[in-house]
């Protein structure tokens, strides 16, 4: 894990050949949906493991079949809330939660409009109560403009959680700057920080639309009435 000196509390995993190999497969335009999903799960599991190293542990004593010995207890891991942004973040969350099995999970449905305003619409939010003892982890594969994440983080600002983290696959510097301007204390963990955003708000070189690549392209809304009329 590498601390990026351009910002406080921003880390990447560019020093991990294993994750860089996984990312290479995700970038490949020929990678199929199932392989893409598995790659996101893999990244989530690895990054979740690394996150546990940043949490507090308490010393404890445990009785083995032979004698007592010292061990550790994860103090923070029992107070984790994972927030998943539909739909691309589901596989990433699946990997994360393997390291935080007692975590509470919240779901947010948010969509970003087109350039130039990139308007954010939050259509659905169902999250557990957050307390000052909790660590909130927001999983979103792509930190592009940062607008969606800012909207989500605002939902928890008044709860004053102990820590707020973002876990993603790729980030653009523009997105990190936007998030940090609103939430300077949020911690950001991504596999890699890419070069920039293009005019359409996509990360470059990026990996395309993570949701479509993980689950397939969705039906157009105009097709839904036709589906309802099918007998």
UniProtKB/Swiss-Prot annotation:
<feature type="binding site">
    <location>
        <begin position="140"/>
        <end position="148"/>
    </location>
    <ligand>
        <name>5-phospho-alpha-D-ribose 1-diphosphate</name>
    </ligand>
</feature>
<keyword id="KW-0328">Glycosyltransferase</keyword>
<feature type="binding site">
    <location>
        <position position="112"/>
    </location>
    <ligand>
        <name>5-phospho-alpha-D-ribose 1-diphosphate</name>
    </ligand>
</feature>
<dbReference type="GO" id="GO:0044206">
    <property type="term" value="P:UMP salvage"/>
</dbReference>
<keyword id="KW-0547">Nucleotide-binding</keyword>
<dbReference type="GO" id="GO:0006223">
    <property type="term" value="P:uracil salvage"/>
</dbReference>
<dbReference type="GO" id="GO:0005525">
    <property type="term" value="F:GTP binding"/>
</dbReference>
<keyword id="KW-0808">Transferase</keyword>
<feature type="binding site">
    <location>
        <begin position="208"/>
        <end position="210"/>
    </location>
    <ligand>
        <name>uracil</name>
    </ligand>
</feature>
<feature type="binding site">
    <location>
        <position position="203"/>
    </location>
    <ligand>
        <name>uracil</name>
    </ligand>
</feature>
<keyword id="KW-0021">Allosteric enzyme</keyword>
<protein>
    <recommendedName>
        <fullName>Uracil phosphoribosyltransferase</fullName>
        <ecNumber>2.4.2.9</ecNumber>
    </recommendedName>
</protein>
<dbReference type="InterPro" id="IPR029057">
    <property type="entry name" value="PRTase-like"/>
</dbReference>
<comment type="similarity">
    <text>Belongs to the UPRTase family.</text>
</comment>
<keyword id="KW-0342">GTP-binding</keyword>
<dbReference type="GO" id="GO:0004845">
    <property type="term" value="F:uracil phosphoribosyltransferase activity"/>
</dbReference>
<comment type="function">
    <text>Catalyzes the conversion of uracil and 5-phospho-alpha-D-ribose 1-diphosphate (PRPP) to UMP and diphosphate.</text>
</comment>
<feature type="binding site">
    <location>
        <position position="87"/>
    </location>
    <ligand>
        <name>5-phospho-alpha-D-ribose 1-diphosphate</name>
    </ligand>
</feature>
<dbReference type="GO" id="GO:0000287">
    <property type="term" value="F:magnesium ion binding"/>
</dbReference>
<dbReference type="InterPro" id="IPR000836">
    <property type="entry name" value="PRibTrfase_dom"/>
</dbReference>
<keyword id="KW-0460">Magnesium</keyword>
<dbReference type="InterPro" id="IPR034331">
    <property type="entry name" value="Upp_A"/>
</dbReference>
<dbReference type="Pfam" id="PF14681">
    <property type="entry name" value="UPRTase"/>
</dbReference>
<feature type="binding site">
    <location>
        <position position="209"/>
    </location>
    <ligand>
        <name>5-phospho-alpha-D-ribose 1-diphosphate</name>
    </ligand>
</feature>
<comment type="pathway">
    <text>Pyrimidine metabolism; UMP biosynthesis via salvage pathway; UMP from uracil: step 1/1.</text>
</comment>
<feature type="binding site">
    <location>
        <begin position="38"/>
        <end position="42"/>
    </location>
    <ligand>
        <name>GTP</name>
    </ligand>
</feature>
<dbReference type="InterPro" id="IPR005765">
    <property type="entry name" value="Ura_phspho_trans"/>
</dbReference>
């Amino acid at each position: 894990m590498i601390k990026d000196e351009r910002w406080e509390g921003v880390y990447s995993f560019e020093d991990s050949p294993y994750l860089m190999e996984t990312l290479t497969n995700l970038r490949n335009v020929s990678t199929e949906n199932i392989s893409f999903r598995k790659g996101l799960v893999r990244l989530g599991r690895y990054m979740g493991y690394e996150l546990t190293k940043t949490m507090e542990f308490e010393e404890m004593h445990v009785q083995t079949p032979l004698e007592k010995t010292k061990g550790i207890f994860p103090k923070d891991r029992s107070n984790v809330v994972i927030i998943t942004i539909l739909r691309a973040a589901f596989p990433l969350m699946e990997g994360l939660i393997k390291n935080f099995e007692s975590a509470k999970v919240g779901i947010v449905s948010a969509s970003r409009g087109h350039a130039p305003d990139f308007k954010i619409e939050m259509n659905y939010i169902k999250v557990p109560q957050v307390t000052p003892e909790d660590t909130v982890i927001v999983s979103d594969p792509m930190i592009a403009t940062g607008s969606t994440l800012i909207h989500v983080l605002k939902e928890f600002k008044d709860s004053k959680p102990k820590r707020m983290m973002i876990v993603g696959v790729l980030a653009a510097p523009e997105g990190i700057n936007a998030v940090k301007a609103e939430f300077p204390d949020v911690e950001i963990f991504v596999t890699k920080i890419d070069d920039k955003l293009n005019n359409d708000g996509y990360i470059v070189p990026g990996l395309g639309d993570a949701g479509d690549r993980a689950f397939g392209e969705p039906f157009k809304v105009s097709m839904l009435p036709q589906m309802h009329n099918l007998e």
